[in-house]
C-alpha cells in the first residue's frame, strides 16, 4: 500500500511537467518569427515624385515607429503608432494587418535622409530606408522658355534683293548681246568644190574652198 502511494505521488508531477512542456512547445510553434520583407532600401526620386516605402511581416503588426535621420538632426515622425491610417505634415502612414506603408505624395528636399523603422509584431524588427530627392533632370515641355528667332534686319533683306536683281540683269544682258551678235555676224558655211584639171585626191593638192 505504501509502495503504491509513493508511485502514484511520483507519477503525477511527471505528467504535469510533461503537459507544461507540451503547452510551451505549442505556444513557441505558433509564435513564428516576424521575418519582414520590405521594398528597396535605396530610393532615389526627382523632386515632386510620389514615394512609397513598405514592409510586410509574418505576424500582425502591433505598432510602428519611424524616425528620419539627417546630417542635421533626428526627427521622430511616428512613434509606437498602432494599426490605422495617419498623416503628419507631408507623411502618410498606413498600418493594416501585416503591412505598413509610408507614403510621400510630393517629395521635396526636406524628405531626404535615412528612415529608421521599428516594426513590432511578435518581435521587434529594425529596417532602414535611404531616400534621396534630386532636382528634376529636365523641365517639362510646357515649362521650357520659348526663344523667338529674330527677323532679318531690313538692310540685310535689301542687300539680298539687290544682289539677286543684279545677277538676273547680267544674265539677261549677256543673252541679248549674244543674240544680236549672232544676227549681225552669222557664221558663213563653207563649200568645197574641186578645181578642173586637178586630180581628185592627189597628194599635196587640196580642195579649193570658196565662199558662197
From Swiss-Prot:
Q: How does it sit in the membrane?
A: Single-pass type I membrane protein
Using the chain's own numbering, where are the disulfide bonds? 38-55
Mind listing the UniProt keywords for this protein, alphabetically? Cell membrane, Disulfide bond, Glycoprotein, Membrane, Secreted, Signal, Transmembrane, Transmembrane helix
Signal sequence, start to end: 1-28
Q: Is Cell cycle there in the keyword field?
A: no
Tell me the subunit arrangement.
Answer: Interacts with CD7.
What protein name applies here?
Secreted and transmembrane protein 1b
Organism, scientific name: Mus musculus (Mouse)
Amino acid at each position: 500500500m505504501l509502495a503504491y502511494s509513493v508511485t502514484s505521488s511520483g507519477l503525477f508531477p511527471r505528467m504535469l511537467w510533461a503537459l507544461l512542456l507540451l503547452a510551451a512547445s505549442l505556444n513557441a510553434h505558433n509564435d513564428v518569427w516576424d521575418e519582414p520583407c520590405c521594398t528597396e532600401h535605396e530610393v532615389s526620386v526627382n523632386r515632386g515624385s510620389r514615394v512609397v516605402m513598405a514592409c510586410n511581416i509574418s505576424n500582425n503588426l502591433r505598432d510602428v515607429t519611424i524616425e528620419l535621420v539627417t546630417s542635421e538632426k533626428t526627427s521622430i515622425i511616428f512613434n509606437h503608432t498602432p494599426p490605422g491610417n495617419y498623416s503628419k505634415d507631408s507623411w502618410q502612414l498606413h498600418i493594416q494587418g501585416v503591412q505598413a506603408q509610408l507614403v510621400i505624395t510630393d517629395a521635396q528636399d526636406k524628405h531626404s535622409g535615412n528612415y529608421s523603422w521599428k516594426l513590432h509584431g511578435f518581435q521587434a524588427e529594425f529596417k532602414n530606408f535611404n531616400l534621396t530627392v534630386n532636382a528634376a533632370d529636365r523641365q517639362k515641355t510646357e515649362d521650357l522658355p520659348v526663344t523667338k528667332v529674330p527677323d532679318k534686319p531690313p538692310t540685310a533683306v535689301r542687300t539680298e534683293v539687290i544682289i539677286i536683281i543684279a545677277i538676273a540683269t547680267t544674265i539677261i544682258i549677256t543673252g541679248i548681246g549674244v543674240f544680236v551678235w549672232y544676227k549681225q555676224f552669222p557664221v558663213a558655211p563653207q563649200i568645197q568644190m574641186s578645181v578642173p584639171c586637178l586630180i581628185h585626191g592627189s597628194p599635196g593638192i587640196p580642195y579649193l574652198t570658196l565662199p558662197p
